[in-house]
Amino acid sequence: MSKTILITGGSSGIGKSMGEFLTQKGFKVYGTSRFPEKYTDSLFPILKLDVTKADSIRECVETLLAKTNTVDVLINNAGVGITGPLEEIPMAEMKNNFETNFFGPIGMINAVLPSMRKQKSGLIINITSIAGYMGLPFRGVYSASKGALELITEAYRMELKPFGINMTNIAPGDFSTNIAAGRYHAPLKDDSPYNSTYGTTLDLLNDHVDDGEDPLIMAKIVYRIIHTKNPKIHYKIGAFLQKFSIVLKRLLPDHCYERLLMSFYKL
């Protein structure tokens, strides 16, 4: 019997690519969106979900279980970017980012766990970011939210092993998606001391997304993980230099690594 897969944020970008690929491989895939009515032509059904609202999470999972009786794989893919000098990002926007990138996935995990525990099996894949392994200038909130999800994945994984439930983390680098269009950019003050350096960083970020990897790569990695009996804790996916940056962080003294990042971002 084919497995049922729930992908949050499955209406565009990496989520859509994963959903279409896994559907073509014979899985019963359900994606989510805050506005499912916009995606009536989707290759797989799109359920209504706002990961920042507990009632929406509960209703989404209940709707899926009423249709399928099971959730075999949860892919926490929904996320949002945020940039800006930490001094000038409104606190409310920082909290909003964590609601989507960190607390939202936790809410989804906790909502599907009773069903997975009952069937004594399940796989949860958290999509984070290579940026979560390091604090990046003008991306500090995003790095922190993704890094927090990476760490809590490790804790959840150990707690859930006795129930036959696996959890893993996929940290992608830059992929060619529309993520830049939905990214929150903190509005700078007219006399902000960060005007020039922040602008340079934004240009670099947008260039990297435009030249990013094919999202189909992520879809194929997920397919392989689903067929792996004991997935690794962490998967880093992306260009060689992006993955190597994580290795360098472990090998280099902190101040040397910091200088490398500052040079890269022209600071």
Model-assigned labels for residue ranges:
Residues 43-55:
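Rossmann-fold cofactor-recognition segment
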Residues 11, 15, 19:
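N-terminal Rossmann NAD(P)H-binding glycine-rich loop of SDR-like oxidoreductase domains
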Residues 161-209:
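C-terminal beta-strand-loop-alpha-helix "lid" module of Rossmann-like NAD(P)-dependent dehydrogenases
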Residues 109-110, 154:
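A short, exposed helix-loop element centered on a Lys and neighboring polar residues
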Residues 109, 145-148:
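Active-site helix of classical SDR
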Residues 129:
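Residue(s) in the substrate-gating loop at a strand-loop-helix junction
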Residues 85-86, 90-95:
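Substrate-binding pocket helix/loop in short-chain dehydrogenase/reductase
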